[in-house]
Structures are given as structure tokens and as C-alpha cells.
Design a protein with these regions (language model features):
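Long, charge-rich, low-complexity alpha-helical segments
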Residues: 1-147, 197-257
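Low-complexity, glycine/alanine/valine/leucine- and proline-rich hydrophobic stretches
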Residues: 152-219
Length: 257
């Protein structure tokens, strides 16, 4: 007989993981009424993604009186229902699928907000970057930017570089304050880096050409010297850039072979 902890883990997984819930492995255990489990799991899914949509699409929610589209409205749509058989709560794939639905739903309002497309890309990136597995215990330190040539920087999976046509960071706080006329964002090319620490903290920072180059070149195989040469940076400048990226959660260091 499996122990109580194993049974609890199986039930929790079944509630969070729709493909597992439909599997023979789960069904043959016959631990609970399948219809009741399915109803409760779908309730949890809607609640889980309601919280995330409200949090990550809060700026679009603030514009709802202009767009006529509340982001969380997709949770009652046939399109969201169609996702339910494949939903895995907290997974990056599911977060991306839900975020795409929200983006399409809000964009369809065709509101006269010039930066709406940029805003939706930003919010979608935030929601997707936040998703995925967490590290719940600190392991051995992997080194920092000055750890030596044997440590090779690697861009963390899920890190996103955004190129926007409007300077969103300058107006985001204004969207959450009382306003009569829609706050306007300056139209200028803006590069943002969106990253998440191993513990799930999402951070956004302004980026530039050198930061973008380092993020693209840090693949875990190149040394600091090699990256500096390709990116056209001095080693000291590269180390400072990398330290900032490590602090954001965008880059980690691994030992070279």
C-alpha cells in the first residue's frame, strides 16, 4: 500500500495536472469520484488563472473602461474551456496559452490606445516568465561574474528581451492612478529585459545593445573573454553587465568542462 504522503501527492498532482488526471495511472487508483475531481480541478484552474491574470494584466484591467475588455473575461469563454483538458497549473506552456487568449481578447476591442499592443506584449511576457518550476531550497552557489574563466555564463531559460515602440515604464504607474484621459506613453524605441529568479521573483529592467548582445551570447559554452570579444566590451564592463544580469535572474554561471 502506498503511504499517506504518496497518496496526497497523487491527489494534488491530479487536481493540478489535467493530462495526469486523464491517465490510466491515475484512473486505475480509483481514489475519488472522477466527476467530482474534474469539477473541483476546473474550479481551481479558473481561480488560479484569475489571480494571475488580475495581477499580470493589471494595466489592461485599468484600461478596461476604454477597451471594453476585462482581461479575466476569457475565463468564461469557450476558448478557455478548450484549454482545460491540457492545463497544468503553474506550467510555462499553460501560462503562455492563457496569456495568448487574454492578449487576443483585449486587442479585439480595437480601442484607440496607441501603445496597447506593446502593453499586451509586456504583460504577456510577465505572466509567462513568472511561470515554471521553482527552486525551494538554496543550493551551492554557482559563482558570480568574477568567478574566473572556468565559469561560463548562461542565459536562464524563459528570460525575455522586448523591443517596444513606446516607453511603457514611464506611464505604467499612471495607469493605476485615477485618470480621466488615457495616460499617453512617449513614442520611442524601448528595450526591456524580463527575467525571473530561481525562487520566482520577476524583475524588469531597461536594456541596451550591449545587454542584449550578452544575453544572446551567454549560452553556457563561451568564456567571459570570448563573449567580451564578440560583444565588443571590455572584460570589466562585461563583468559589471553580467553581475547585473545575475542579480536580475537573467543569467547564471555554470562550470565549463
Amino acid at each position: 500500500m502506498p503511504d499517506d504522503r504518496a497518496l496526497q501527492d497523487a491527489v494534488i498532482r491530479a487536481l493540478a495536472d489535467a493530462p495526469f488526471r486523464a491517465s490510466l495511472e491515475w484512473r486505475r487508483r480509483a481514489l475519488a469520484d472522477p466527476d467530482r475531481v474534474e469539477r473541483y480541478a476546473r474550479f481551481l484552474a479558473r481561480h488560479f488563472y484569475h489571480e494571475r491574470i488580475v495581477h499580470f494584466f493589471k494595466y489592461s484591467r485599468a484600461l478596461a473602461r476604454v477597451t471594453g475588455r476585462a482581461p479575466e473575461g476569457i475565463l468564461k469563454s469557450p476558448a478557455f474551456d478548450a484549454l482545460l483538458p491540457g492545463i497544468i497549473l503553474g506550467s510555462r506552456d499553460t501560462a503562455a496559452a492563457v496569456a495568448r487568449l487574454v492578449t487576443a481578447h483585449v486587442a479585439a476591442g480595437q480601442a484607440p490606445v496607441p501603445y496597447l499592443a506593446d502593453l499586451l506584449r509586456y504583460e504577456e511576457a510577465m505572466m509567462v516568465v513568472e511561470a515554471g518550476a521553482r527552486v525551494w531550497r538554496d543550493g551551492a552557489p554557482s559563482g558570480g561574474a568574477g568567478s574566473g574563466e572556468r565559469f561560463r555564463p548562461e542565459t536562464v531559460e524563459g528570460t525575455v528581451l522586448l523591443e517596444l515602440s513606446f516607453d511603457l515604464p514611464s506611464i505604467l504607474p499612471k495607469l493605476l492612478q485615477p485618470w480621466t484621459d488615457v495616460p499617453q506613453a512617449p513614442e520611442r524605441l524601448t528595450k526591456l529585459l524580463v527575467a525571473r529568479s530561481a525562487h520566482g521573483r520577476v524583475a524588469v529592467a531597461r536594456s541596451d545593445e550591449s545587454v542584449a548582445a550578452v544575453v544572446h551570447l551567454a549560452d553556457g559554452t563561451r568564456t567571459l573573454g570570448e563573449i567580451a570579444g564578440v560583444a565588443g566590451l571590455g572584460v570589466e564592463d562585461l563583468e559589471a553587465t553580467l553581475q547585473g544580469l545575475v542579480d536580475l535572474g537573467a543569467v547564471r554561471f555554470s562550470s565549463g568542462s
